C-alpha cells in the first residue's frame, strides 16, 4: 500500500521524504524493524519510542510517524510524518492497512466496571442462536467460529484490533462483539471505529491511580466516550452514574 493511502483520514505534516513509498506493514515495536515497514513512535508511560527511531531506520524501516520533533540527521532517507497523536494515527492507519473491516460488520461494544465479560458472552450466545456469525474480543481472549486466541489486554492495541477484525471478516463473521475498556478509549485503541450498539453495565470506583485514571470523574468521562461513537446505546438505568456518563 502506498504511504499516502495508508494515511487516509490522518492529519499530518510531511517533514521529510515522499508519500509515494510502498509500505508493507506498520510496527510500533522497534524490535520488529524491517525493510518496507512504517514505525509509529509512541510516547509511553515507561519509555518514549521516539528514542528508537534511528535504530529502526538503520534496521530498514522506510517511514516514521512522530508526535514530536526528532533529529532528522539520524534518520536519513526515511519519510518522516508528524502528527498530533501517534496513537490516534496508529489506529486510523491500522484500519486502512486492513481495509477498515469494522465498517463491514455489525459492531457491538460493551463497557462498564463489572460484567463486561459476562455480558459479551451472553450476547454472543443469543446472537449465535439467532444465526449470526460472531467474533468476540475481551478479557478472556478472542473467540470466533470455534477458534480461541489469548490477548494481553481487555481491549487490544489498535493494530491488533484491526488485524483481528480482518480475521473475523475473512472467516465469515458478520458481527464483531467486544469489551471496550476505559484504557482502550483513553489510549485511542478504538479510534476510528463506529459502533452500531454501545452497552453500559455499571460503574464503580476502580482503575483510579498511577498509569490509569487520576479521578473517578475522569474514569467516568472516558467510559462515556463509547456513546459518542455509537448509533444506539443500551444502558443500565439503575446505575447512579448513567446520566452523568451519557
Residue spans for each PLM region:
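Residue-level signal for inorganic ion chemistry
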Residues: 6, 37, 56, 93, ...
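Walker A (P-loop) phosphate-binding motif
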Residues: 95-141, 147-148
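Acidic, Mg2+-coordinating active-site environments of NTP-dependent enzymes
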Residues: 7-9, 70-77, 171, 197-246
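N-terminal leader/targeting and accessory segments in enzymes
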Residues: 1-92, 228
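Short loop/helix-cap segments at secondary-structure boundaries that form the rim of catalytic
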Residues: 33-34, 68-78, 143-145, 188-194, ...
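Switch II (G3) loop of P-loop NTPases
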Residues: 173-183
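P-loop NTPase switch/communication element
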Residues: 140-160, 164
Amino acid at each position: 500500500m502506498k504511504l499516502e493511502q495508508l494515511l487516509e483520514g490522518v492529519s499530518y505534516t510531511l517533514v521529510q521524504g515522499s508519500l509515494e513509498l510502498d509500505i508493507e506493514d506498520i510496527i510500533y515495536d522497534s524490535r520488529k524493524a524491517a525493510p518496507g515497514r512504517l514505525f509509529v513512535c509512541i510516547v509511553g508511560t515507561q519509555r518514549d519510542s521516539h528514542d528508537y527511531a534511528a535504530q529502526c531506520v538503520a534496521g530498514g524501516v522506510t517511514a516514521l510517524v512522530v508526535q514530536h520533533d526528532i533529529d532528522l540527521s539520524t534518520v536519513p532517507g526515511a519519510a518522516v510524518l508528524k502528527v498530533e497523536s501517534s496513537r490516534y494515527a496508529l489506529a486510523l492507519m491500522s484500519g486502512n492497512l486492513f481495509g477498515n473491516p469494522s465498517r463491514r460488520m455489525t459492531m457491538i461494544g460493551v463497557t462498564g466496571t463489572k460484567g463486561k465479560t459476562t455480558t459479551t458472552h451472553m450476547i454472543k450466545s443469543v446472537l449465535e442462536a439467532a444465526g449470526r456469525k460472531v467474533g468476540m474480543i475481551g478479557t478472556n481472549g478472542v473467540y470466533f467460529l470455534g477458534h480461541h486466541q489469548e490477548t494481553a489486554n481487555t481491549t487490544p492495541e489498535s493494530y491488533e484490533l484491526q488485524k483481528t477484525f480482518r480475521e473475523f471478516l475473512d472467516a465469515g463473521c458478520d458481527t464483531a462483539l467486544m469489551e471496550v475498556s476505559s484504557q482502550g478509549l483513553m489510549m485511542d485503541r478504538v479510534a476510528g471505529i463506529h459502533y452500531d450498539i454501545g452497552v453500559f453495565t455499571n460503574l464503580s470506583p476502580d482503575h483510579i491511580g498511577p498509569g490509569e485514571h487520576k479521578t473517578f470523574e475522569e474514569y467516568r468521562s472516558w467510559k462515556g466516550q463509547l456513546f459518542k461513537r455509537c448509533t444506539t446505546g443500551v444502558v443500565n438505568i439503575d446505575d447512579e452514574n448513567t446520566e452523568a456518563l451519557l
